[in-house]
Amino acid sequence: AATPLALSSDAFGWRTPFVGVAIVTALIGIGYFLGVRDHPDSTDKQAKPEPIRKVIGGLADVIRSPGLAPIFAMHLIAYASMLTVLGLWAAPYLHDVHGMDSVARGNVMFVMAAAQVFGVLAYGRLEPILGSKKRTVITGGLGTVLVMAILALWPSPPLWAAAGLLVLHCLIASYGIIIVAQGRGLFSDHLAGRGVTTVNLAQVTGCFVLPIMTGALIGAFPEINGQVPESAYRATFACIGICVVLGLVAYTKSPKT
């Protein structure tokens, strides 16, 4: 994605890169099918799947787990706040407000994506320093709110500042992995798979709800000369920041682990 996609789209049109990605994805899927075993050597190959009644009962136990609700609420917005900016609004913002072409936008987004990956690794190191998963998540959430507030309140920032803030946002907002780890700690081993899946359901839900919300907000602003005005993007950054604040308020009731 990002720079490679922008370069290939300029050279071949947008369809060819997507066909290429589809082929690579298919090859990876075939490799996974051929190379991954259902039963590693350390597992019981004779184990039978649970009956549906036990599966549903286990899911009910997961939903009733103390401490799940605040973790679910925070995970609803944590990853979505990053992905909505990186995957949806960063490129239009850089084009409409700062006049960047597709390759230049791709370069910024490439660095944003790299920052997100680095952030995931960095949060694993940061958690022991801060002393708890809860403190780490709150730190990341407050940092996200701060970056969104700057982008929302700063009219016409210079390009270097806008791009830097977008990269910083992806770096700071990559604390979702800590929420997943905290959620895993709520469940016994036999419920671990269903428990983590339930926690990640919040991430998936947020990643389609927040883009819809921000898209409706952007659409409420009339275009000027065929472009979305800066005020629409600033309102969107404010909306994302407010959503993170609401998630943090709910998350304060989570267990300290």
Model-found features: residue ranges?
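Helix-to-loop junctions at the C-terminal end of transmembrane segments
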Residues: 119-132, 218
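Cytoplasmic membrane-interface "Motif A"-like loop-to-helix N-cap segments
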Residues: 128-142
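Extracytoplasmic gate region of multi-pass secondary transporters
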Residues: 66-123, 207-215
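C-terminal ends and interior cores of transmembrane alpha-helices
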Residues: 142-156
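Juxtamembrane intracellular "pre-TM" segments in multi-pass secondary transporters
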Residues: 39-72
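Helix-loop-helix hairpin linking two adjacent transmembrane segments in secondary transporters
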Residues: 1-40
